[in-house]
Amino acid sequence: MKYLTLLCALLLSSCYEVERNCNEFKTGTFESKITIDGVQYNSIFSRTSKLQVEEFNGVKDSTYVRWINDCEMIFKTIHPKNLAEQKDIHLKILTTTQNSYKFEYGYVGDTNKQLGSATRID
């Protein structure tokens, strides 16, 4: 009986697929929320298929956007001001809802990832 219950649980859980309708979020205006070391940071950004302009703490920053696939992209800062801004950022959309998505991001080649969410505001 234990094995039957375990088998049923495995079969049911393997059928669940996370919704990822990433194409709905390739362009638009969004509010992003990330938490780093227990502090939440909010920003507003607008994205076209090739460019993203973000405002954080009153400072605007522009990046080129290169889509790797439907749910992953690389950001390259247009006018980097320091070495950290010269590093490209990889972002992967993990899950989507009707008007928001959860994502992970980090420097290209770095195993350290941060999590965040973005909500469409346009």
Residue spans for each PLM region:
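Positively charged n-region of N-terminal signal peptides that target proteins for export
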Residues: 1-4
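Tryptophan-anchored aromatic micro-motifs
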Residues: 22-38
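An anionic, turn-rich surface loop/hairpin at beta-sheet edges
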Residues: 75-98
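C-terminal motif of bacterial Sec signal peptides marking the signal peptidase cleavage site
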Residues: 11-14
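Short, exposed beta-strand-loop hairpins at the edges of beta-sheets
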Residues: 54, 102-115
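A short, structured loop/turn motif at beta-sheet edges
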Residues: 64-72, 93-100, 120-122
